[in-house]
Amino acid sequence: MEADGDGEELARLRSVFAACDANRSGRLEREEFRALCTELRVRPADAEAVFQRLDADRDGAITFQEFARGFLGSLRGGRRRDWGPLDPAPAVSEAGPETHDSEEDEGDEDAAAALATSCGPASPGRAWQDFQARLGDEAKFIPREEQVSTLYQNINLVEPRLIQPYEHVIKNFIREIRLQSTEMENLAIAVKRAQDKAAMQLSELEEEMDQRIQAAEHKTRKDEKRKAEEALSDLRRQYETEVGDLQVTIKKLRKLEEQSKRVSQKEDVAALKKQIYDLSMENQKVKKDLLEAQTNIAFLQSELDALKSDYADQSLNTERDLEIIRAYTEDRNSLERQIEILQTANRKLHDSNDGLRSALENSYSKFNRSLHINNISPGNTISRSSPKFIGHSPQPLGYDRSSRSSYVDEDCDSLALCDPLQRTNCEVDSLPESCFDSGLSTLRDPNEYDSEVEYKHQRGFQRSHGVQESFGGDASDTDVPDIRDEETFGLEDVASVLDWKPQGSVSEGSIVSSSRKPISALSPQTDLVDDNAKSFSSQKAYKIVLAGDAAVGKSSFLMRLCKNEFRENISATLGVDFQMKTLIVDGERTVLQLWDTAGQERFRSIAKSYFRKADGVLLLYDVTCEKSFLNIREWVDMIEDAAHETVPIMLVGNKADIRDTAATEGQKCVPGHFGEKLAMTYGALFCETSAKDGSNIVEAVLHLAREVKKRTDKDDSRSITNLTGTNSKKSPQMKNCCNG
């Protein structure tokens, strides 16, 4: 049995030795052994000790006999291993340095055992090669192949059951890498195509510019050549004329000479002298003319040289213009790319806005269907709480829950708002009531809103105001009650709303609770009814923009003003939000368009565009955040840069109710006199408010609206929206703006 066991051990050792002998030389060199131990995470000192123990003949290589003798001795256990005649086993009874040798022997044995276990019959190197062969050409996509192969061999040695999952992981990685490489190639091809297209466009532009330059150069040369030829032809004609005159003079002189020969000298001496004098004078005149002609020729030559220099300068300027045009082309391409990015972002925002709008309309339609299923008309359902109207009594419109006698009165007021035509006049006359919009932020320009207002005028008259009116009708993007045409409603509709009574009893479960609080500075109801009759004919909407850093409470301020509500966790404004509010300013009914801008840095450019046509600005800061107060100067500079004229500004210190609490907690707060000084510096109004308890909200808006009305009365050319009804027409400039 012992012999059979030794035979099996020798067979295993032979397979292990064959796996370690990579070059099939029958000998393990020192470098091969070190590389094998490095892959197996064996310390270099232990690897050297194991090699020295196995290398019995000290020839620098291990044969199979030495390998088998050393490992058989370690596998048989104990301290009785036969290490050969050159290295006898150490004595157990001795102390001192021999104990240290014994510890080294144990370390060598552990390293040898690890080597024997790792290089078992399974042959991890061969398994890795087989796996690579199965992969085929995909093996070249393996990143860091050496580390992957080492981990593969270690897993094969420690836990062979994990080999198959590991192979699946490697295949998945290879598949992903191939996909990534394919995508990178496609991207490279697309980039190359774009570059080629840009190069073609640039080359076409260069060719066009070259053609234009050549045409201009040819035209200039042709003109200069024509002018030079004309000048030379003039000079040639003058020269020929003068030569002809000289020839005629010479002929005359010859004739006179012949005549003088024929006549006697005594008779003609005086005449000849006179003729000679005349001819000499004429000769001098001709010489003078010749000199002038030569001077003109020199002057024309200098002009020709100047034209040549001008032509050279124009050529240089043309080259410079070409360089500038190339730079402009590059800038234009960059701007086009930026515009495409902005258009993509704008489309995404519009898509999200449409999705939110459709979700809101679906929710309202589901609510209406549930009402029809339960045989409950929308007219008997409370949509939202509103201030109480009591006929034509002269009591004030104050919103006080303690003054209500029962839930039935509150339900009656709420049910009166279900009729869209009656609800419009009701909401306009009540100061603390909200002017609803979609509730969604929008990035549209105010001019687009004017076009939709005209469309809403036409559509609002066609809606029935009976029981069939659904809540989805007021959930459109710009279906704001205050924008509807109020002139067609008349005072009779106002009276009908004030005299409206419920058709049936309303349960307590239908009453909607809210966090609304009473707002001060309200006018009596009778005054509002009288103001309705005066303001139907001429009603203007003033554009008020809310600005300030993020999280200063602009949306809460607007919600408290329009809806008389306060919500703790309100979402941040994306882009711009819009509300309408009607106030009584100096006894006149005034409609305000309130634009809530986002305070984040990425929306600053959008907010800046709304300052251009703003009639007034509510500039908010947080009294518990000093940074928002320090940024007020930057906001004021932005408003002054965007607005063409001086815009009234109301500086509002919000969150005044929590300033003392924040100060006790150690936060750096902004005192009230700091805000007053800053407002005096810029000539602005100042007020501290609290959107949570509603203090000074309406007062701040009233003061700003009063200042806006004063400014607009002095300057009628301000950009305001005329809401006088269907009889009023838009100005040509507004039509061109909306229809362009």
Curated annotation (Swiss-Prot):
Assembly with partners or alone: Homodimer. Interacts with the dynein-dynactin complex.
Subcellular locations according to the entry: Cytoplasm, Perinuclear region
Coiled coil regions, renumbered to chain: 175-356
One Gene Ontology CC term in the entry: cytosol
SUPFAM superfamilies linked: EF-hand, P-loop containing nucleoside triphosphate hydrolases
Binding site for Ca(2+) 2: 55, 57, 59, 66
SMART domains, per the entry: EFh (SM00054), RAB (SM00175), RAN (SM00176), RAS (SM00173), RHO (SM00174)
Role: Binds predominantly GDP, and also GTP. Acts as a dynein adapter protein that activates dynein-mediated transport and dynein-dynactin motility on microtubules.
Cell wall biogenesis/degradation as UniProt keyword: no
InterPro entries assigned to the protein according to its UniProt record, in alphabetical order: EF-hand-dom_pair, EF_Hand_1_Ca_BS, EF_hand_dom, P-loop_NTPase, Rab, Small_GTP-bd, Small_GTPase
Stretches with biased composition (Acidic residues): 101-110
Protein name: Ras and EF-hand domain-containing protein
The EF-hand domain, residue ranges: 8-42, 42-77
Stored Pfam families: EF-hand_7 (PF13499), Ras (PF00071)
Result after altering residue 555 to N: Impairs nucleotide binding and perinuclear localization
Gene Ontology molecular functions: calcium ion binding; GDP binding; GTP binding; GTPase activity; identical protein binding
Disulfide bridge positions per record: none
Tissue specificity annotation: Down-regulated in cutaneous melanoma cells but not in breast cancer cells.
Protein origin, superkingdom: Eukaryota
Family: Belongs to the small GTPase superfamily. Rab family.
Keywords, comma-separated and alphabetical: Calcium, Coiled coil, Cytoplasm, GTP-binding, Metal-binding, Nucleotide-binding, Phosphoprotein, Repeat
GO biological process, one term: vesicle-mediated transport
Residues that, per the record, bind Ca(2+) 1: 21, 23, 25, 27, 29, 32, 61
Amino acid composition bias (Polar residues), ranges on this chain: 376-386, 719-740
Region (Disordered): 82-110, 376-403, 713-740
Modified residues (Phosphoserine): 377, 383
